[in-house]
Amino acid sequence: MTAFNVVRFRVKPGRENQFVDEHRKAKSDFPGLRHAALVKTGERTYCLVGEWDDMSSIVGAREGMIALLDRFRDTLEDLGGGLGVTDPVSGEVVLDLKR
C-alpha cells in the first residue's frame, strides 16, 4: 500500500541556499521512492514530502535518509519541544483523493 513520509525543517538564517543545494545534489534513488519534493512552507521553513511504494520501503531507506540528513544537519535550527532539527512523520495512504 502506498505510503508517504513528511519531514519538517527550519533552516538557520543565511543557510537556505546551502540547504536547497544539498537537496538538489542528493541522489534520491532509494528503492521504492516514487516521488519526492522539497516544499517551502514559510520563512526559513520547509517540508520534504516523499511518496513510496509502501512502509517497508521507508523503513529500508531510513539509514540512507539519515546519512543524507547528516550532510546538511548543520544548516538546521532546533525546532524546540524536544524534536531536534527535524519533525518526521510517515504512514500509509488510507484514502487516495485524486490521481
Give each language-model segment a name:
Residues 3-9, 47:
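Active-site-flanking beta-strand signature of metal-NTP-handling nucleotidyl enzymes
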Residues 8-19:
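Short, surface-exposed ligand-recognition loops at beta-strand->loop->(often short) alpha-helix junctions
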Residues 11-13, 54, 95:
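Non-catalytic surface loops within mature trypsin-like serine protease
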Residues 24-35, 51-87:
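An amphipathic, aromatic/His-enriched active-site/gating alpha helix that lines ligand/cofactor pockets
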Residues 45-46, 58:
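Short catalytic/ligand-binding loop motif for oxyanion handling, primarily in non-cytosolic enzymes
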Residues 87-99:
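Short, low-order "capping/linker" segments at domain edges
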